[in-house]
């Protein structure tokens, strides 16, 4: 099954209590798998039905979050899920003992172009998992946040490889969240 190191296990445990769950680190360091596993654990009990998974492209999201070389959502929920369409959107549809036989839908979308946000409009999402968030267009990031306003258990799981310290993902989001967290405003 899964053989996580202590640092990875501690991060996954902490995700239960945090709205924002963000991992930055080297390529192949396990960031995405940690977030996928934490996301899957929350998916089992969240009251929200529809969730969002994004990558720079839809293919990237499906490979890194859905498959993840045998560690993705389709493997965690094997025998309880199938790939398909949900309201014309690419989705992993989950329903089985892990979700107490309540249907959970994870919509997959690409996020790198300026009009990617149009694909996720019209839905409300509970949780959002994004891989390589630094490659997402700002329009999509803003729209994904807006689409979570009605969530019963709002959670965000992001991963990224290190970028230039002045990159927009830091200036517009990560540095802002860090400052708010230090002030107790998150």
Q: Residues of each region from the PLM?
A:
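Phosphate/NTP-binding elements of NTP-utilizing enzymes
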Residues: 1-186
């Amino acid at each position: 099954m899964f053989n996580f190191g202590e640092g990875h296990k501690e991060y996954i445990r902490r995700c239960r209590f945090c709205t924002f769950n963000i991992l930055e680190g080297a390529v192949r360091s396990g960031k995405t798998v940690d977030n996928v596993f934490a996301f899957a654990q929350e998916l089992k009990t969240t009251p929200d039905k529809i969730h969002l998974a994004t990558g720079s492209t839809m293919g990237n999201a499906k490979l890194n979050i859905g498959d993840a070389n045998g560690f993705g959502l389709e493997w965690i929920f094997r025998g309880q899920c199938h790939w398909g369409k949900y309201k014309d959107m690419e989705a992993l549809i989950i329903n089985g003992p892990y979700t107490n036989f309540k249907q959970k839908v994870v919509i997959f979308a690409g996020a790198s172009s300026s009009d990617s946000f149009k694909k996720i409009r019209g839905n409300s999402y509970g949780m959002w998992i994004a891989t390589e968030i630094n490659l997402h267009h700002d329009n999509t990031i803003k729209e994904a946040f807006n689409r979570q306003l009605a969530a019963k258990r709002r959670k965000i799981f992001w991963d990224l490889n290190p970028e230039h310290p002045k990159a927009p993902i830091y200036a517009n989001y990560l540095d802002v969240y860090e400052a708010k967290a230090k002030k107790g405003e998150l």
